[in-house]
C-alpha cells in the first residue's frame, strides 16, 4: 500500500534501482521499483515522488516525457553529465554520480515546494 513516504524508482538498470531504493529505505522511505514507465503508472498516483533514470527517456521517449510532466513537480530525473535534455519544467534533475545526501536534498526540496 502506498502512502506519503513511498517513492517510486523507475530505471532499466536493476543495479541502479536497487542502489537508489537502498539509499531511500535506509532513510525511512518505502520504495517501489520498476523497469519501465508503463509498469509504474498506477503506483505513482499516491507516491511522494518518482525518480526516473534518463535511460528510460531513450527506451520509452514519449511515455517517459508524459510521465514526467504528469507528476505535478513530484519527479526527479537522474541524468549523466552528457545528457542533452531541455531544461526541466515540471521536474527536478540530479546528475549522476550522486550521493545519498544529494538525493535526499532534492527529495526534501520537492516536499517543501509541495507544501
From Swiss-Prot:
Keywords: Plasmid, Repressor, Transcription, Transcription regulation
Highest rank taxon of the organism: Bacteria
Function: Prevents transcription of the intermediate key regulatory genes nifA and fixK by counteracting the activity of the FixLJ two-component system. Acts as an inhibitor of the sensor hemoprotein kinase fixL, preventing the production or the accumulation of its phosphorylated form.
Self-association state and partner proteins as the record states: Interacts directly with FixL.
Protein name: Transcriptional regulator protein FixT
Species this protein is from: Rhizobium meliloti (strain 1021) (Ensifer meliloti)
Source species taxonomy: Bacteria, Pseudomonadati, Pseudomonadota, Alphaproteobacteria, Hyphomicrobiales
